[in-house]
């Protein structure tokens, strides 16, 4: 796809260029957090519905050994960004690293744990890659959006449907991000 703007041809990113279900594999003190394994499991379910792969993104310093553990739990691929600046969690270096991975590899879905770190990292990253983020999801599934399309309304298929509590937990909302990639969520 190309966009012609004032005589210049600008490459326009098509949604079909985004592939795979990615998870941020949180580690603290070079030990993987439980949420990393939980996200790999959920990502495997979503990836099966989309006929794609699960990629774990591991950020830190001297963390390469943890990649094997993620593979044993079901990640098809592990991208390791190993840098002394990532020894302990700080928003800016971690956000820069995750944004660069997203920009290079173009995941269709990016899941982050709804931990203190994930609640800081997720919104920062989603803003920088210009996509939405659904926070504190309790259910994720692949489906059509809008769920109950009106006659004549276009329905998009294979969307990430993200369910979360709304209005103080009195109701639930199912949210989709049909026009932007990656589809991002923090997951409880």
Predicted regions and their residues:
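N-terminal glycine-rich FAD/FM-binding segment characteristic of electron-transfer flavoproteins
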Residues: 1-188
């Amino acid at each position: 796809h190309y966009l012609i703007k004032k005589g210049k041809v600008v490459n326009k990113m098509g949604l079909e260029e985004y592939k795979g279900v990615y998870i941020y594999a949180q580690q603290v003190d070079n030990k993987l957090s439980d949420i990393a394994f939980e996200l790999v499991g959920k990502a495997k379910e979503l990836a099966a519905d989309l006929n794609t792969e699960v990629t774990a993104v591991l950020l830190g310093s001297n963390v390469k050994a943890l990649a094997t553990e993620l593979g044993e739990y079901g990640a098809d691929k592990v991208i390791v960004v190993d840098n002394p600046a990532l020894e302990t969690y700080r928003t800016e270096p971690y956000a820069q690293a995750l944004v660069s991975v997203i920009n290079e590899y173009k995941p269709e879905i990016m899941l982050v744990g709804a931990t203190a770190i994930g609640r800081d990292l997720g919104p920062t990253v989603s803003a920088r890659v210009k996509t939405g983020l659904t926070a504190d999801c309790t259910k994720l599934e692949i489906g059509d959006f809008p769920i109950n399309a009106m006659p004549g309304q276009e329905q998009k298929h294979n969307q990430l449907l993200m369910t979360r509590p709304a209005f103080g937990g009195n109701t639930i909302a199912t949210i989709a991000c049909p026009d932007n990639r990656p589809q991002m969520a923090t997951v409880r």
